[in-house]
Regions:
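TPR-repeat structural position
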Residues: 42-43, 135, 185, 220-221, ...
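Helix-coil-helix junctions within alpha-helical repeat/solenoid scaffolds
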Residues: 301-328, 334-477
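Flexible glycine/proline-rich, aromatic-decorated loop/lid segments
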Residues: 256-273
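Short coil/linker segments at helix-helix boundaries
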Residues: 2-58, 63-151, 158-198, 208-218, ...
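Soluble catalytic regions of membrane-associated enzymes that act on cell-envelope
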Residues: 202
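Active-site-adjacent "gating/activation" loops or surface patches in catalytic cores
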Residues: 205
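Solenoid-repeat scaffolds in large eukaryotic assemblies
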Residues: 45, 93, 156, 188, ...
Length: 477
């Protein structure tokens, strides 16, 4: 093994897929690229595939991997690429696809099939219908590959990924527990569970990762807990994979384990951040892992853990990162600057809320400013100063109007201005409650619940629980 491979400091476990290359270094870099792609760290995945290409320019699968890593994924479909980013990305992908096709004749039959399939993943134009068409074409192409090589775990994972991306974050109807109309969730469940019966499947990060994403929205998320437990320590330095089991831990109420997994994930993320910095899209996943740690700690009543994680997150979220225009980092990340407000509200730290300063840059920190108004409004109401709470309520409504529709909430894929409408109704309920108008208060909280229920599945604050708590306080009163 060469010097470059020996110096690579990330522990990615032992997963290996043999590809057609006589160069041992190229094989090592290919394996790393594939694992990182399963871990949704697409930039590091692409970097590894480029290293593999440098070691063996004739390896078709390394070009395939580069094209795959740079394309759309479950959390970032084509329509969320900004124009500049999309143009540059498509140029790189098209070159990789050409090289993959040129070198495919020297590859195995399965590798040739994968190279052929990924050609369909590039849109013919730059409109939404073009994106939809290429996603469908790629899923159809991968279905053909799966029909020929259904016992191959990588083929199964890639096929599952292609189909799930047709209905990303919309796989199940949360009210009925049934698949959403037009989704192929039961089909994916069937072939992933068939794969889970194979030997060595618990060593495959892609299968385990996708099965968690598939089942977390279902009415039976607990069935994926075994897969989650195998994934927990499988790829120690891939923060997102270390974090993923916590999606299920939260749903089944295992907050202790959710805290532990997210704490480990944050350490892995910080290891990568210390070497490469934060000027990359993986910063979104890094913030999500911090957010999930904070979220679990809030549910567990651990204010110290939550506040320490908030401070770590804030330190790694400088204005310079938010100011990057392509991709538009503020749209993806600025909302995380507002998380401290949620923690202080959760633990009733009213004076700290009232002391929170507003950022100077009202455009860059538009979500944070709105959230601070929300938090101060709750604090004033809780302390009995309804007049000041009403002023904050008015300021909140004006602040929400300033938030562009492109700003994503931490509860991806929801938009911040939509999520804050839940906060508006909650604050209205809190104020009415403090005014002694309980019927009006509960109507506002019920409205907050309706707005919350209308959000796309994510990991949101439980408005129903807050409503129940308010009813309990009324009974006590």
């Amino acid at each position: 093994m060469g010097t470059a491979s020996k110096s690579y400091q990330y522990n990615l476990g032992t997963y290996h897929r043999k590809v057609t290359t006589a160069n041992a270094e190229a094989q090592v870099w290919f394996d790393r690229g594939l694992i990182w792609s399963y871990a949704f760290h697409h930039e590091e995945s692409a970097r590894c595939f480029e290293k593999a290409i440098a070691e063996d320019p004739g390896c078709a699968m390394s070009y395939w991997g580069l094209a795959f890593a740079l394309g759309p994924n479950y959390n970032k479909p084509w329509d969320l690429f900004d124009e500049k980013e999309l143009k540059k990305t498509l140029e790189t992908i098209e070159h990789a696809l050409t090289e993959a096709k040129d070198h495919a004749p020297d590859s195995t039959e399965l590798e040739q099939a994968l190279v052929d399939a990924v050609q369909a993943r590039v849109p013919k134009g730059l409109q939404e219908h073009d994106f939809k068409a290429c996603n469908e074409a790629y899923a159809k192409a991968m279905e053909s590959v799966y029909e020929r090589f259904s016992d191959d775990l990588d083929v199964t994972a890639l096929f599952a990924d292609s189909v799930m991306n047709l209905s990303a974050w919309d796989l199940w109807d949360l009210k009925t527990g049934k698949p959403t109309p037009g989704s192929r969730s039961l089909e994916v469940k069937g072939f992933l569970e068939k794969a889970l019966e194979q030997d060595n499947v618990y060593e495959h990060p892609g299968i385990l990762h996708l099965y968690i994403h598939l089942m977390e929205m279902s009415s039976t998320p607990e069935v994926a807990l075994v897969a989650a437990d195998h994934l927990r320590n499988l790829v120690p330095d891939a923060g997102h994979l270390v974090h993923m089991p916590s999606h299920l831990d939260i749903l089944v109420g295992d907050y202790r384990r959710a805290i532990a997994s997210n704490a480990d994930a944050c350490l892995a993320d910080e290891k990568y951040h210390n070497e490469h910095g934060g000027d990359n899209f993986y910063s979104f996943y890094r913030m999500h892992d911090y957010h999930s740690l904070i979220y679990a700690a809030m549910f567990a009543g651990q204010s110290k853990v939550a506040l320490e994680a908030v401070s770590r997150m804030e330190r790694s979220l400088p204005a310079s990162l938010l100011s990057i225009e392509s991709p538009p980092m503020a749209d993806w990340l600025e909302n995380f600057s507002s998380v401290r407000v949620h923690v202080l509200v959760r633990f009733g730290r009213w004076q700290e809320l009232l002391s929170l300063p507003f950022p100077n840059d009202k455009d860059l920190y538009c979500v944070t400013i709105a959230m601070i108004h929300y938090g101060k409004g709750v604090a004033y109401a809780a302390m009995g100063d309804v007049e000041k709470a009403l002023r904050e309520r008015a300021a909140l409504k004006e602040a929400v109007k300033r938030i562009p529709s492109s700003r994503i909430c931490g509860d991806f894929p929801n938009k911040s201005n939509v999520v804050l409408k839940v906060g508006e109704a909650m604050l209205d309920g809190e104020i009415a409650y403090r005014q002694g108008d309980y019927d009006v208060a509960f109507r506002h909280l019920e409205e907050a619940i309706k707005r919350d229920d209308a959000l796309t599945y994510a990991e949101p604050w439980p408005v129903r629980i807050l409503s129940d708590l308010s009813h309990s306080r009324d009974i006590d009163h």
